[in-house]
Regions:
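Long, low-complexity intrinsically disordered regions
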Residues: 1-215
């Protein structure tokens, strides 16, 4: 309820839990790329959603959620339908995804077991924007500090960045990383977390464990 942790689509088109204070600068890094992914989905599904429709929906969603309101996607669909907006097929999901990409909405309180949406600016405290280079560096620090050892490919998959962007991010924090090679691959280890002593206990996590996959 305080917006300290929010659920949204931010690095890849899947749910992520994000610290509210980090949400805006992360959106600055990823939203344009994510919008292209969503647009390709729309085209592949045969839907025709224009930029004007997205703008109209963003405005309507902003109005219906203003004042601390929280609505489920089904409730948003009903309101959009009443306003004369096409809601057939998978359109409403795309409208809401775009509103997330634009930084208009994020998760609000769940309602009857279904995810609710609230206005980002009402749910999350204001935060300063970051220069792109600083945002890339911060994302890399957050990743390698919690996921080391990891490869460039790992970072690209997790972050949704391009290879060039990921390389730039790693390069900007190289003084914080140690490069190790194993079976022909370069792994980056966050130096402050590096341990050289042997461990008697090894803990394994399953694929797609939320701690590793989500942020």
């Amino acid at each position: 309820a305080k917006g300290e942790i929010v659920r949204t689509h931010i690095m890849r088109p899947t749910w992520h839990y994000v610290a509210g204070k980090d949400l805006r600068w992360m959106l600055q890094l990823t939203s344009s790329r994510l919008k292209k992914v969503i647009d390709s989905w729309v085209k592949a599904s045969g839907l025709d959603i224009s930029e004007n429709q997205y703008t109209q929906c963003n405005d309507l969603i902003g109005k219906m959620l203003s004042g601390g309101n929280c609505l489920t996607r089904e409730e948003i669909e009903m309101e959009l339908g009443h306003a004369g907006v096409p809601v057939t097929g998978d359109r409403v999901r795309r409208y809401v995804l775009r509103a997330e990409m634009e930084g208009i909405v994020c998760s609000g309180a769940d309602k009857n077991g279904k995810p609710g949406y609230a206005l980002l600016d009402e749910q999350v405290a204001p935060a300063s924007s970051l220069p792109r280079e600083e945002a890339l560096a911060r994302l890399a620090v957050n990743y390698f500090r919690s996921h080391s050892p990891a490869t460039l490919k790992d970072f690209v998959w997790w972050s949704g960045l391009t290879v060039t962007e990921a390389q730039q991010a790693i390069g900007s924090i190289k003084e914080l990383l140690v490069e190790e090679h194993f079976e022909g691959q370069a792994f980056w280890v966050f130096a402050a977390c590096r341990k050289t002593e042997n461990r008697d206990l090894i803990q394994l996590l399953p694929p797609f464990d939320e701690y590793l996959v989500s942020y």
